[in-house]
Design a protein with these regions (language model features):
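Secretory targeting and sorting signals
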Residues: 2-32
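Acidic, Gly/Ser/Thr-rich repeat motifs that build Ca2+-stabilized beta-propeller blades
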Residues: 25-171, 223-229, 271-306, 320-354
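Surface-exposed loop and turn segments in beta-propeller and other repeat-based domains
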Residues: 81-92, 135-150, 190-208, 244-269
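Short loop/turn segments immediately following beta-strands, especially the blade-tip
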Residues: 122-131, 186-195, 240-248, 252, ...
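Loop-centered beta-sheet repeat module
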Residues: 176-192, 196-221
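Short, Gly/Ser/Thr-enriched beta-strand-loop segments that form substrate-interacting elements
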Residues: 306-312
């Protein structure tokens, strides 16, 4: 496998992550520097039911709905059509049909099936406007499920491998247990096999010590970022390194302790509860549920941020950079914890005026 050269921004982020794991003598830091920014929105589609993830099949947007387990495709006018459903999904609480990803004509899904979360793939059949789903093929089973902390974000990295975030499912100790799939970021081939260069031989575990990570994205230099729900003290943005230990449940937020990698940015949960993230241009964008805002973190200075749309559209579950370079945000007010409006839930095109 070819290795990507790391540019200045990726090197800066990696250096900051290394600083966070080695500088353990300093006192824990507080919240990062934040400013308010202005943005406008345009509605792409309405009437979604507890939507969780957006992915693209070519230029066609696909949306997952957590509770109905449906996959929807959107046409150019924003009208939604059901492609199919992910059979066997049995959620409850935070479980259900969660993340989706598309690769080589297949839809990959992460869904709760009773006592476990599983990753499956199905061929996307027919053409845009009449897409269907083929038979399921199981990629990975045995990820512990619970009414809380299921993780659930999946994405293909620039190395062509599939990454998945898993929560601790309320079993705190599992996050530090490298034989468990819970509380991890996993890395696998498209068939679910262990890549030869994974940091732990014979293991899908790429990083560990996570509580409930729900966002993963890469910058142009191949640096991996992840957002994570903390408990009561700090939510996090992390730069992920292979084999890294991110501390949960021993630490939360920037603790400065030996052996644990600190986040590059942290926020109080009331202002955050970060879910899906996307890299667009020179920034990481983070959707926030409880915080009801879109947060921008510049790659060149990941200890600062700008906040948009605060309180304007309610809970935000996902943010994606579209094939044409637009930025979309997915609201999540029908998930049982929000106050849905008459058109919820929606996908919004976000314009930062640049």
């Amino acid at each position: 496998m070819k290795r990507r050269r790391r540019g200045a921004r990726g090197a800066a982020a990696a250096a900051l992550a290394l600083t966070m794991v080695t500088a353990c003598s300093s006192a824990p830091a507080g919240e990062s520097s934040t400013t308010a920014g202005a943005a406008s929105t345009e509605t792409i589609t309405t009437g979604l039911d507890a939507p969780w993830s957006v992915a693209f099949h070519g230029g066609t947007p696909l949306v997952s709905e957590r509770d109905s387990a449906r996959i929807l495709e959107l046409d150019t006018a924003g009208s939604a059509r059901e492609v199919g459903s992910i059979g066997g999904t049995a959620g409850g609480g935070e479980g259900g049909l969660l993340g989706i990803a598309v690769q080589d004509g297949f839809l990959y899904s992460y869904a709760t099936a009773g006592e476990e979360n599983r990753i499956e793939r199905r061929e996307l059949t027919r053409s845009t406007g009449s897409l269907g789903l083929g038979l399921p093929e199981v990629i990975l089973t045995g990820i512990e499920a619970a009414p809380i902390h299921n993780g659930g974000r999946i994405a293909f990295g620039p190395d062509g491998l599939l990454y998945a975030t898993t929560g601790d499912a309320g079993n705190r100790g599992s996050a530090q247990d490298t034989t468990s799939l819970s509380g991890k970021i996993l890395r696998m081939t498209a068939d679910g096999a262990v890549p030869e260069d994974n940091p732990l031989p014979g293991s899908l575990v790429y990083s560990y010590g996570h509580r409930n990570p729900q966002g993963i994205a890469w910058d142009a230099e191949g640096t991996l970022y992840s957002s994570e729900f903390g408990q009561n003290t700090w939510d996090e943005l992390n730069v992920i390194t292979a084999g890294g230990n991110y501390g949960w449940p021993e630490v939360e937020g920037i603790a400065g302790r030996n052996g644990f990698i600190d986040p590059v940015q942290q926020w109080k949960p009331v202002d955050a509860s970060p879910s899906g993230i996307a890299v667009s241009g020179e920034s990481v964008f983070i959707s926030n549920l409880r915080g009801e805002r879109l947060r921008e973190v510049p790659l060149a200075d990941p200890r600062t941020s700008t906040e948009y749309l605060t309180g304007e559209h309610g809970r935000l579950r996902d943010v994606v950079s579209t094939p044409d370079g637009s930025l979309w945000a997915l609201t999540n007010n029908t998930d049982g914890r929000g106050g849905p409006g008459p058109d919820d839930d929606r996908i919004l095109r976000v314009d930062l005026g640049r």
